[in-house]
């Protein structure tokens, strides 16, 4: 869906996409959206897939400057199995791509003005997912302070960890620490819903929240 000038010129999102019965192996992400997504990415269904030895399962990347048409919404994973995936679910709104990617404006954890350059991440939904032998963490969700991720839903999702895994940085953004066998980490998210979610063998809390407005289904740590 392109960078901001392409999104403004063509107004053409990537949408109504079905990915099913696929094997993804040995890459940075099983299914990736962004970071060049100024036209938007919407209504994506990933089902009946196997992801093996990838750094991440779902990988969403965006950043300030991608534009108000850069909407990522209605991304659904269901009936998916993962084996030896470093971080099964990653949504990163502070991706440090492009020559200015490490600047204070892109990476600031302080609220910036919401303007024509501000992207939006809406609903990201995971149902019936088995992630075995995870490495870094179960999930890493990093929104923008001024435009948090709207809603993360996990239902019938189960994680186990690889005790022999090595630490990994789950999201490519300044200040993101290397993780090992962590649970779900969420920062700048409006709403998290978890139903029948298990995390087995993690270090620390199952859910580690910072600037998350509402949590349903698990006691916020």
Model-derived segments and spans:
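Extracellular/periplasmic carbohydrate-active domains that bind, remodel
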Residues: 1-221
């Amino acid at each position: 869906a392109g960078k901001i000038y392409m999104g403004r010129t063509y107004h053409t999102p990537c949408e109504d996409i079905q990915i099913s019965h696929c094997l993804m192996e040995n890459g940075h992400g099983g299914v990736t959206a962004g970071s060049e997504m100024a036209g938007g990415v919407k209504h994506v269904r990933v089902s009946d897939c196997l992801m093996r030895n990838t750094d991440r399962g779902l990988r969403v990347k965006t950043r300030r400057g991608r534009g108000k048409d850069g909407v990522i919404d209605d991304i659904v994973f269901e009936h998916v199995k993962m084996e030896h995936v470093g971080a099964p679910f990653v949504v990163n709104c502070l991706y440090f791509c492009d020559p200015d990617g490490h600047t204070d404006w892109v990476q600031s954890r302080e609220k910036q003005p919401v303007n024509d350059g501000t992207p939006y991440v809406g609903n990201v939904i995971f149902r019936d997912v088995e992630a075995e032998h995870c490495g870094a963490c179960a999930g890493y969700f990093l929104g923008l302070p001024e435009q948090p991720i709207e809603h993360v839903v996990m239902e019938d999702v189960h994680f186990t960890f690889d005790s022999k895994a090595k630490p990994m940085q789950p999201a490519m953004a300044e200040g993101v620490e290397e993780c090992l066998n962590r649970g779900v980490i969420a920062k700048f998210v409006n709403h998290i819903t978890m139903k029948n979610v298990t995390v087995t063998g993690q270090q620390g809390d199952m859910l580690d929240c910072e600037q998350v407005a509402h949590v349903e289904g698990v006691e916020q740590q």
